């Protein structure tokens, strides 16, 4: 009887210890770090859409790091998320990236390019506009005041001796959401629009006419239209995560360039998954004829955008110290 009781006690102890050990293992297996990545559901953020769709970043970082993707609709909201620490790495336009660098006193830096070019100047069908000079007295739409396309337009106007009406000139610049431009043109409320892809291809498919192609907008189309930024604090605390992110970003870039047909399908499927809508095959294919997918930052274009931002009053000072971290 005593032996049986002893066996029972020992067995109970073993089960308890084993259970405790299993609970401990469960705790150790939990992900101990998190990386928060911001992006737009837009084809100019191609690598983000590829990595999110295929889960390549999650797989490469392993079981100890969880990846959280957060979609934004505008640069300022993403910048605020960077400042608050809600995101660590982000795909964003070069102009808000510059603004974030200045406002954060250098804590937000550019760590890679993502895409280049990808914007066109189109006009309402039949409008008497054949060059930038013809925008005199016209209404031109841009997606958002102070964004990349707006700065490109301001540079084009200045190069042709024109100014927006807000600066005593004759060109009315109107901020119109990309999705609303087609209807606005159709109503005759605007004469022209400088828009990013895929909206350029979409407008051209709906009877708008080309005024300037992507390589006539700024820097022969080699300017950065989307870059990758990161918080320096996160980079210093998690260099291995940032390094792995950049490797996967590079791999996604290579995949898009080497296998465009299948990559565009992946990107389009991800857009549909996220927004409920996909692009027509002809639209996304035409759009990518005007978009360069690259990791190499064009420093001249970034500096140019910084100069325009300062001269137009969108930033109070030029970036001091490190803006592009290689």
Predicted regions and their residues:
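Pocket-lining segment of extracytoplasmic ligand-binding domains
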Residues: 95-96, 167-170, 174, 179-268
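Bacterial signal peptide processing site
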Residues: 26-28
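Secondary-structure end/capping motifs
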Residues: 236-312
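C-terminal solvent-exposed extensions
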Residues: 306-326
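C-terminal motif of bacterial Sec signal peptides marking the signal peptidase cleavage site
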Residues: 21-24
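Short, glycine-/small- and polar/acidic-enriched structural segments
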Residues: 31-165, 170-175, 191-197, 211
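Hydrophobic helical h-region of N-terminal Sec-dependent signal peptides
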Residues: 11-19
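Bacterial N-terminal signal peptides that target proteins for export
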Residues: 2-11
């Amino acid at each position: 009887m005593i032996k049986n009781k002893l066996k029972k006690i020992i067995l109970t102890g073993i089960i308890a210890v084993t259970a405790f050990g299993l609970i401990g293992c469960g705790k150790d297996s939990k992900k101990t770090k998190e990386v928060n990545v911001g992006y737009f559901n837009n084809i100019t953020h191609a690598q983000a859409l590829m990595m999110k769709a295929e889960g390549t970043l999650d797989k490469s970082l392993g079981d100890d790091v969880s990846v959280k993707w957060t979609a934004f609709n505008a640069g300022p909201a993403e910048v605020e998320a960077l400042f608050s620490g809600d995101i660590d790495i982000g795909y964003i336009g070069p102009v808000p990236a510059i603004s974030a660098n200045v406002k954060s006193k250098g804590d937000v830096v550019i760590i890679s390019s993502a895409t280049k070019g990808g914007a066109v100047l189109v006009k309402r069908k039949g409008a008497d506009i054949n060059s930038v000079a013809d925008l005199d007295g016209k209404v031109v739409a841009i997606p958002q005041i102070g964004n990349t396309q707006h700065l490109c337009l301001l540079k084009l106007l200045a190069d042709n001796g024109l100014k927006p009406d807000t600066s005593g000139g004759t060109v009315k610049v109107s901020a119109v959401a990309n999705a609303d431009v087609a209807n606005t043109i159709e109503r005759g409320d605007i004469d022209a629009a400088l828009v990013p892809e895929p909206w350029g291809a979409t407008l051209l498919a709906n009877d708008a006419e080309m005024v300037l192609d992507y390589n006539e907008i700024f820097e022969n189309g080699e300017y950065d239209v989307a870059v990758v930024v990161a918080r320096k604090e996160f980079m210093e605390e998690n260099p291995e995560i940032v390094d792995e992110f950049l490797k996967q970003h590079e791999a996604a870039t290579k995949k898009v360039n080497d296998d465009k047909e299948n990559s565009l399908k992946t990107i389009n499927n991800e857009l549909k998954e996220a927004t409920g809508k996909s692009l027509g095959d002809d639209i996304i294919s035409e759009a990518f004829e005007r978009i360069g997918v690259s990791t190499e930052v064009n420093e001249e274009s970034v500096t140019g955008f910084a100069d325009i931002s300062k001269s137009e009053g969108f930033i109070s000072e030029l970036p001091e110290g490190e803006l592009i971290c290689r």
